[in-house]
Amino acid sequence: MARVKAGSGARTTRGTAAHPPLADSGPVVAPAALRRSLGDTAEALFPLVLDAAALARREVDGPELLERFAAWGGDGVVVADTAGSAPGEERVGAWLAGHRDRDRFRLLGRFGGSPSAVASPRALVTRVEESLRRLGVERLDVLAVRPDGAGRLDQLLSAVEVLLARGLVGTAVASGFAAEELFEARVLAGHGHPRFAGVELPYSLLDSTRADGDLGLVAAGQGLSLLCTAPLAHGFLEGVERGRRQLGRLPDGVLAAAHVGRRGRRVLVALDAIGAELSATPAAVALAWLLSRPGVTAAAVAPRSPADVDAVVRAVSLELDAGHLAALERARR
């Protein structure tokens, strides 16, 4: 839990009932049946976590978005050490500091290798410390660590061990690892290094290459949870913007527009049909499909408004039957 300084994964119970009205007073805590375990740890998460990258945008009302997410029982926020992420971290920290039920929220931090953020052991510890200062909290509940590209996995895991020992991190998951690296990490864990509890990877109706391939097989064999990024294919599966030009205006427009074509259209048609039947948006149907996949603990979403939050959270209680799942499988192939 996010402690503020002074001064499948687990399967869920679903139903087709509409969301209840938001409470006017008192915190809303997701029922235990909705929260999913993270590997073999004591951590459990609401099936959707909020990507703080959305909060760094000027047009987004961060506190309002966070309040809406929390009102539906959401309890996980993802922060990262990417360029321009500091404003989002500061918004999250300020909101947590003033929240009446702040201790129920989990912070997931994504740190590691890119040309501007090399994941050397010392740099990893330093960047986590800097992030904690911006957030105004004492620890990250989950650390998603990326490889440094230099093959020094033992050193990287040693840095994770330091963070765990100092209480700056609760548990760790692998992010951006190849299947071979994940296997090596398990071997190193057998020699005393920290063991990963899960794997963070891109996973959606239109991108399941890693989850369906060797990485997914190794993760399943090790009992690791899947934490999914880009679950709506960078906005394409929201179904709001469908033309290449319109998609290009999204925050990840180039990546979203890459799905324009026959396959993308087939998937959107299937999402539209199922959504019309179940009174749900294409985004909710796409997320419900993902949350039904084996091993999935949570998906990171980046809504841009409270209405977007309402739409995506519908996925948590949406039940897709065998016919719906078969239609989506046909469309995405």
What is each PLM-predicted segment?
Residues 39-44, 93-106, 132-137, 161-164, ...:
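Acidic (Asp/Glu)-rich catalytic clusters
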Residues 3-17, 21-26, 30-32, 148-333:
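Beta/alpha (TIM)-barrel catalytic core signal, keyed to glycine-rich beta->alpha loops juxtaposed to Asp/Glu
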Residues 2-106:
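N-terminal binding-site loop/beta-alpha segment at the start of enzyme catalytic domains
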Residues 132-152:
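Active-site groove signature of glycoside hydrolases
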Residues 51-63, 111-123, 146-148:
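Active-site mouth loops of central-metabolism enzymes
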